[in-house]
Amino acid sequence: MKFYYHDNDSSVDQCAPHDSGEPVTAEQLEKIGVLAFHYPDVEDVNRLAKERKYTNRDEVTITPEAMGGQENYEKKLKVFYEEHLHEDEEIRYILDGEGYFDVRDKDDRWIRAQLNAGDLLILPSGIYHRFTLSEKNYVHTMRLFQAEPKWVALPRPVDNNPYRQEYVKAISA
C-alpha cells in the first residue's frame, strides 16, 4: 500500500502510477476520514466487518475478459474514473491484483492510493474520489456494505448533497 499526491499529468494513461514523488502519510489520510489497513488474512477483514457492522459483501473481478471484452472494459474504467461520491462508506479489500483509488484532500488535490492484495481502504461517505486499475489490468476485490449492496455514484459537483456537506463539516473541525 502506498499513498502519494497524483502528478495530474493528463497526457499519461489513467492506469499509470502518476506518482508525483510527494508521499502522503496515514495521518494525512485520517484527517480527511480515509482509513487504510493491510490484512493478509481474510479473518482480519471479518473482524473489522463485525466491528463496523458490515453485514453484506460481494466480490468483483475487473479484467477485460470479466467485463465482456476490451471495449466494455475501457467503458467501465471510464465510469469508475469519473469523479464522484457515495452516500455510504466505500469499503474495498483487495484479494488479488492491483488498483488505484484517488481521493481529494482538503485543498482539492488528488491523493493516489495504490492498493495490492491484502490492502483494505475505507472511504467516508461524501468524499470525492475515483478508481482505476494499474497497468496490470487486473483486480479481484471484495466490497463490504453496512446494508444491502448498492453502488450509486453521484458525479461531481454535488456540493449541496447532505452527505457531502456533513463530510466537509467533519474534516473542517
From Swiss-Prot:
Which cofactors? Fe(2+); Ni(2+)
Q: Which residues bind Ni(2+)?
A: 84, 86, 90, 129
* Stored SUPFAM superfamilies: RmlC-like cupins
- Where does the UniProt entry say this protein principally localizes? cytoplasm
Question: From what superkingdom does this record's organism come?
Answer: Eukaryota
Spell out the residue ranges making up region: Disordered: 1-21
Give me the comment on cofactor binding: Binds either 1 Fe or Ni cation per monomer. Iron-binding promotes an acireductone dioxygenase reaction producing 2-keto-4-methylthiobutyrate, while nickel-binding promotes an acireductone dioxygenase reaction producing 3-(methylsulfanyl)propanoate.
Do the record's keywords include Cytoplasm?
yes
Q: Which reaction does it catalyse?
A: 1,2-dihydroxy-5-(methylsulfanyl)pent-1-en-3-one + O2 = 4-methylsulfanyl-2-oxobutanoate + formate + 2 H(+); 1,2-dihydroxy-5-(methylsulfanyl)pent-1-en-3-one + O2 = 3-(methylsulfanyl)propanoate + CO + formate + 2 H(+)
Subcellular localization, per the record? Cytoplasm; Nucleus
Q: What is its EC number?
A: 1.13.11.54, 1.13.11.53
Question: Binding residues for Fe(2+), per the UniProt record?
Answer: 84, 86, 90, 129
Q: Which InterPro entries match?
A: ARD (IPR004313), ARD_euk (IPR027496), RmlC-like_jellyroll (IPR014710), RmlC_Cupin_sf (IPR011051)
Q: What class of enzyme is it?
A: oxidoreductase
PANTHER family according to UniProt: ACIREDUCTONE DIOXYGENASE
**Its family?**
Belongs to the acireductone dioxygenase (ARD) family.
Record function comment:
Catalyzes 2 different reactions between oxygen and the acireductone 1,2-dihydroxy-3-keto-5-methylthiopentene (DHK-MTPene) depending upon the metal bound in the active site. Fe-containing acireductone dioxygenase (Fe-ARD) produces formate and 2-keto-4-methylthiobutyrate (KMTB), the alpha-ketoacid precursor of methionine in the methionine recycle pathway. Ni-containing acireductone dioxygenase (Ni-ARD) produces methylthiopropionate, carbon monoxide and formate, and does not lie on the methionine recycle pathway.
Task: List the protein's name.
Answer: Acireductone dioxygenase
Give the source lineage, highest ranks first.
Eukaryota, Fungi, Dikarya, Ascomycota, Saccharomycotina
